[in-house]
Each structure stands twice: as C-alpha cells, then as structure tokens.
UniProtKB/Swiss-Prot annotation:
This is DNA-directed RNA polymerase subunit omega. The gene is rpoZ. It comes from Thermus thermophilus (strain ATCC 27634 / DSM 579 / HB8). SMART domains: RNA_pol_Rpb6. Promotes RNA polymerase assembly. Latches the N- and C-terminal regions of the beta' subunit thereby facilitating its interaction with the beta and alpha subunits. It comes from the Bacteria. It catalyses: RNA(n) + a ribonucleoside 5'-triphosphate = RNA(n+1) + diphosphate. GO terms for cellular component: DNA-directed RNA polymerase complex. The keyword Transferase applies.
Length: 99
C-alpha cells in the first residue's frame, strides 16, 4: 500500500531516485540518533496500533517521509557537507556506545 502523501513527495524532487536517497539518508540519521533529532512534534509522529495500544511507529522510513511532508527539512545541493553535519549531529545527539 502506498504511503499517504507520496504524490506530494514526488512533486518535491526531480526524480524517484533522489527521493529514495533523501528518505534513506534521513532514515539513517534518525536511527543513528534514536529519533531524538526528529523535526516532528509529538502529535505529528507516525503511530502504530498494537494489541497493547497506540505507539510511535518504529519504521524510520515512515518518519523520514512524514518529516519531508512537513516542509521543515532542507535537501539539495550547496548545503553543509555531510561529514560536518554528522559531527554536529553527534555533538548534539551523542550516540550511546555498547560495551
């Protein structure tokens, strides 16, 4: 089943390939930082119904697509280099290392 808003997402990019790359990179960032770096407000977060109740959906791709739909993420050329951005993200949202 297609995600709601997929047509709007396709309209935001010049190709399906670019959309795939943008969503995948954002999903990777969300997973790396435990979703602490999301731009979604609590009431906007994707939900999943389980037998125990309604919980945040653990699917990072769904979160990334929903974030793009809000228009609060910037993607494209001439942005901060990815390595510099990664260092800043690690400073803001430290990754807990398993020992």
């Amino acid at each position: 089943m297609a995600e709601p808003g997929i047509d709007k997402l396709f309209g935001m990019v010049d190709s399906k390939y670019r959309l795939t790359v943008v969503v995948a990179k954002r999903a990777q960032q969300l997973l790396r930082h435990g979703f602490k770096n999301t731009v979604l407000e609590p009431e906007e977060r994707p939900k999943m119904q389980t037998l125990e109740g309604l919980f945040d959906d653990p699917n990072a791709v769904t979160w990334a697509m929903k974030e793009l739909l809000t228009g609060r993420l910037v993607f494209g050329e001439n942005l901060v280099p990815e390595d510099r951005l990664q260092k800043e993200m690690e400073r803001l949202y430290p990754v807990e290392r398993e020992e």
